[in-house]
A protein has these predicted regions:
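C-terminal capping/lid region of NAD(P)-dependent oxidoreductase domains
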Residues: 62, 145-152, 161-187
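Conserved beta-strand scaffold positions in the cores of enzyme catalytic domains, especially
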Residues: 44-45, 115, 153, 175-177
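Flexible cofactor-recognition loop at the NAD(P)H-binding site
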Residues: 50-51, 74
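Aromatic/hydrophobic pocket-lining residues that form π-stacking "cages" and hydrophobic walls in ligand
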Residues: 9, 138, 163
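Short amphipathic alpha-helix with an adjacent loop that forms part of the alpha/beta core around
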Residues: 51-63
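Glycine-rich phosphate-binding loop and adjacent beta-alpha segment
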Residues: 16-18, 33, 75-146, 179-187
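Mid-domain Rossmann-like dinucleotide-binding core that forms the NAD(H)/NADP(H) cofactor-binding site
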Residues: 1-50
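N-terminal Rossmann-like NAD(P) cofactor-binding module of classical short-chain dehydrogenase/reductase
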Residues: 66-69
Length: 187
């Protein structure tokens, strides 16, 4: 949930008055990441270890999530699916772990688990007419400071090495934006 997509989803949920549970890989920075995600609007922040279902119950979070979003795959997706309400969809949009999730048959039968894939490129190809309005809506939220994405800016011509070093940092929580000086070309 501390990825850029996760941060945006948390903020959109907050704007829509939906509760969100942020699940993050614990890379030793939970004490910093947890409070940050809460300021963005996360209702709960959990480390992606052990039983997420038991953690939610321990925190008195009794409503089961109605939607899961996963970009990690493997056991992380299995733990996430275990928390979901019956028939609630788990949407997978990536597999950063490089491992396919493998669910027990009981998830499929008794919980009527639904797993769906999401491919942004395919969605954009089939929804070309919706994209300008969607981007305009997002831009309005950004301009109104209701949607924030953390980033660090570097000048392409003079700070490329610093940007590359920053990109290689483990546990980095910001996106890197390379700025290009005006080259005199108008489009």
């Amino acid at each position: 949930a501390n990825s850029t997509v996760g941060q945006v989803v948390i903020q959109l949920c907050h704007l829509l008055k939906l509760r969100s549970v942020a699940v993050v890989r614990d890379l030793g920075s939970m004490d910093k990441v947890g409070p940050w995600l809460k300021t963005l609007g996360a209702s709960e922040v959990l480390a992606d270890t052990g039983s997420l279902k038991k953690e939610l119950e321990k925190n008195k979070y009794f409503a089961k999530p109605k939607l899961g979003l996963d970009c990690v795959g493997g056991q992380s997706a299995v733990r996430l699916a275990d928390t979901l309400d019956d028939s609630a969809p788990l949407v997978i949009y990536g597999c950063m772990s490089g491992r396919a999730p493998s669910w027990p048959w009981s998830q499929w039968v008794f919980k009527q688990m639904q797993v769906r894939g999401f491919n942004l490129r395919k969605w954009m190809k089939s929804n070309k007419k919706k994209i300008p309005a969607m981007m305009e809506s997002i831009a309005k939220l950004v301009n109104a400071d209701k949607l924030r994405v953390t980033h660090t800016e570097y000048e392409l011509g003079t700070e490329f090495d610093e940007a590359l070093d920053h990109a290689m940092e483990e546990g980095r929580s910001t996106k890197i934006l390379l700025k290009v000086k005006d080259i005199g070309v108008t489009y």
